[in-house]
Amino acid sequence: MIDPAFLSREYNNRELFPDYARHFARWQDGSARARSTMSCALDRAYGASPGETLDVFPARKGDGSALVFIHGGYWRSLDKRDFSFLAPAWVDAGVSLVVVNYGLCPNVTLERIVQQMLAASAWLYRHAEGYG
């Protein structure tokens, strides 16, 4: 049996990187800036639950490519709004960025999160043309 303390050390980046709050603050600042200065469609519902939303940062040029970003947090923390800071680099490169939110554990199961990602993918398939 694997020691739970070992797993916690290996999978909890907040324990591995004690200055994580500084990085999170930088992400929040960059994300707020991206949402306030860039063309974007925020909080588009792909499902009925409050957490089933996504943000679209459409590219102004390019071939219609899109990157779908599913935020980290080990299924139990963080939010799509924490990762809007990624948008400027992708949009400037001609790639639309879609940042997807999902329900967090323990309020939902991992199986439900997989279902949410399938629903988000289906929504994107149906609506992608409207975002270039």
State where each predicted segment sits.
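Short glycine/proline-enriched loop/turn "hinge" motifs that connect secondary-structure elements
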Residues: R60, P88-D92
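A fold-wide structural signal in alpha/beta-hydrolase
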Residues: A66, V91-V98, G103
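Short beta-strand element of the alpha/beta-hydrolase
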Residues: D63-G73
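N-terminal cap/lid segment of alpha/beta-hydrolase-fold proteins
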Residues: F6-G62
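Basic/polar N-terminal segments that are highly enriched at the extreme N-terminus
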Residues: M1-D3
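Catalytic nucleophile-loop/oxyanion-hole region of alpha/beta-hydrolase
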Residues: L78-L86, V98-G132
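Glycine-/small-residue-rich active-site loops that bind phosphorylated ligands and cofactors
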Residues: G62, W75, C105
